[in-house]
């Protein structure tokens, strides 16, 4: 198609792109309606685009197509390995430092006249010392990771089975298990 006006051509459809409908990326121009991932057809913007040659992708599709391949690379939760590396002599040890919460917290709250009971210590939690996390009221001093004891904030916690954890301990204890996950490259050393 001839380009009579001398304007820029869209990197996808090769038709003329006018200023009002133009999106620029890596020196190329695109129609707003053509600025889509080549694979999944999601709309792109400057924060979500990944370029390979003259093809444009969303970051997710780009990673799947051109990212690292092989064992242990993130293809999603459906493909995680449950191999613990035992065939390579790696031993997995369960931590026993878990301190369970008080199972009688609700009875304690009734006993003290309606104030909430702290799930960690079972004592009444009054407004001046109350922190809310995982849908429960905690003392500020009890609002700590159940594994490592690190102080938490309502935005930095993860909860499981009524207990609260820092993001690191939660990932180590309840995240994906298996060879190549969660320990970093130093743990992948194999010595004979």
From Swiss-Prot:
The organism's place on the tree of life at top rank: Eukaryota
Record's protein name: Cysteine and glycine-rich protein 1
Please indicate if the UniProt record lists Transmembrane helix as a keyword.
no
Q: PROSITE patterns under this entry?
A: LIM_DOMAIN_1, LIM_DOMAIN_2
Domain LIM zinc-binding residue range list? 10-61, 118-169
Assembly notes: Probable monomer. Interacts with ZYX.
Location(s), subcellular: Nucleus; Cytoplasm; Cytoplasm, Cytoskeleton
Q: Name one GO biological process term.
A: muscle tissue development
* Comment text on domains: Glycine-rich repeats mediate the association with the actin cytoskeleton.
The protein's predominant localisation is nucleus
- Pfam families recorded for this chain? LIM
What does the record give under GO molecular function?
actinin binding; alpha-actinin binding; metal ion binding; phosphoprotein binding; structural constituent of muscle
Q: Where expressed (tissues)?
A: Most prominent in tissues that are enriched in smooth muscle cells, such as gizzard, stomach, and intestine. Lower level in the heart, no expression in liver, skeletal muscle, or brain.
**Matching SMART domains:** LIM
């Amino acid at each position: 198609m001839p380009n009579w006006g001398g304007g820029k051509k869209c990197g996808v459809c090769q038709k003329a792109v006018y200023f009002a409908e133009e999106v620029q990326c890596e020196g190329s121009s695109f129609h707003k309606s053509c600025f889509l991932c080549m694979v999944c057809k999601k709309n792109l913007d400057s924060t979500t685009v990944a370029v390979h040659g003259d093809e444009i992708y969303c970051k997710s599709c780009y990673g799947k197509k051109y990212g690292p391949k092989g064992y242990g690379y993130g293809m999603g939760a459906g493909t995680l390995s449950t191999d613990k590396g035992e065939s390579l002599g790696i031993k997995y040890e369960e931590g026993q430092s878990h301190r369970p919460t008080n199972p009688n917290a609700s009875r304690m709250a009734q006993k003290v006249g309606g104030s909430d009971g702290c799930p960690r210590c079972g004592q009444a939690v009054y407004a001046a010392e109350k922190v809310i996390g995982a849908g429960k009221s905690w003392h500020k001093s009890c609002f700590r990771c159940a594994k490592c004891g690190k102080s938490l904030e309502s935005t930095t916690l993860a909860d499981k089975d009524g207990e609260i954890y820092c993001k690191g301990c939660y990932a180590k204890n309840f995240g994906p298990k298996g060879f190549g996950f969660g320990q970093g490259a130093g743990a992948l050393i194999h010595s004979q």
